[in-house]
């Protein structure tokens, strides 16, 4: 895509990528940022991980509990709320309810694009 060309997307036209039985996503990515719809069933755990990408998580429906940093500070984020996760901050999440969130990453998550995000595809809860 030429950097001077706009792009228009419809979420329903983007295939939902199942990662495990209780977790799926849809991705839109550009050169400098990524937008993801993330679908989590109640009880779904995203294991502790970190990445160089800055992250914003906006909860549209449901609620997530995050454990942040080495001290695992707990933050609950509900519908209508946004969590900013700085680059390289270890974090883990659990769906307190069936949840739909939108994640924004800068730069794009290369591991999500190339499928090397094995921490997310595993059933282990670390």
Model-predicted segments: where are they?
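A short, N-terminal "cap"/entry segment at the start of jelly-roll beta-barrel domains
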Residues: 1-32, 36, 118-126
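Conserved short histidine dyad/triad with adjacent acidic residue
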Residues: 21, 34-50
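Short beta-strand segments in beta-sandwich/barrel cores
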Residues: 36, 45-46, 62-67, 82-83
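Short, conserved beta-strand element in jelly-roll/cupin
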Residues: 39-41, 51-66
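A cytosolic small-molecule/anion-sensing beta-strand core signal
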Residues: 60-61, 78-79, 97
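Short acidic-glycine-tyrosine-enriched beta hairpin
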Residues: 71-87
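Ligand-binding loop in jelly-roll beta-barrel domains
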Residues: 87-111
């Amino acid at each position: 895509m030429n950097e001077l060309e706009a792009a228009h997307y419809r979420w329903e036209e983007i295939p939902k990528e199942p990662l495990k039985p209780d977790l799926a996503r849809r991705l839109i990515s550009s050169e400098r940022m990524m937008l993801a719809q993330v679908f989590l069933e109640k009880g779904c755990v995203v294991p502790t991980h970190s990445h160089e990408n800055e992250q914003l998580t906006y909860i549209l429906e449901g609620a997530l509990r995050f454990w942040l940093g080495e001290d695992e500070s707990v933050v609950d984020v509900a519908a209508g709320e946004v969590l900013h996760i700085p680059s390289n901050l270890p974090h883990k999440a659990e769906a307190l309810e069936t949840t739909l969130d939108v994640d924004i990453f800068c730069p794009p998550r290369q591991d999500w694009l190339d499928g090397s995000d094995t921490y997310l595809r595993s059933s282990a809860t670390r």
